[in-house]
Amino acid sequence: MSFSIKNNQINGSDSVYFIGEVGINHNGDLELAKKIILEAKKAGFSAVKFQKRNPELSTPESMKSKLRETPWGEMTYLEYKYKIEFGKKEYDEISKYCKELEIDWFASCWDLDSLDFLLNYEPPVLKIASAKITDKVLLESHASSGLPIIMSTGMSTMDEIDKAYEILKNNPLAILHTTSTYPCPPEELNLNMIETLSEIYPENPI
């Protein structure tokens, strides 16, 4: 199965949709985020991807009050999460800037609140982080959007991948073999998994 993200054909063979991972590497600094976006555009990327969270919802209770050292000094983990999280003001500017540069942008959403937030910007595609592949309610909400979806597999088992696939299969869906080790030693890349996923899900770009 092939599908389009705007004018980009996604078919797993003769086309490439280059995604620059911004994630939270902007450290809550809008100007730094814009610099990363500009460099991605210069390098020929098709899109940039962020991570969107509601820190109150996505931070485990046991972690919220834990202290940690940060570039801004010692603070609780929850305070740190809020420090690096962009809100409407920042994403309004990011959306405007990406439109000016003619580069797509979207985000992996880690909770329902963040998904609702992102959908206001009419993203061309949604991204499922491998850490959320077992969140049935979140997957169902992504599926109900009707948008194309990119799903990372990370450290997921084949059973977990298949259960997620059953929820998302009616959407245009690309499945990524990804690693959760950064940086990843070459011997742990297990690139044969790309072929395995292609055999199991022949109708989907891998």
Residue ranges and their predicted role:
Residues M1-I206:
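Catalytic cores and adjacent flexible loops of soluble metabolic enzymes
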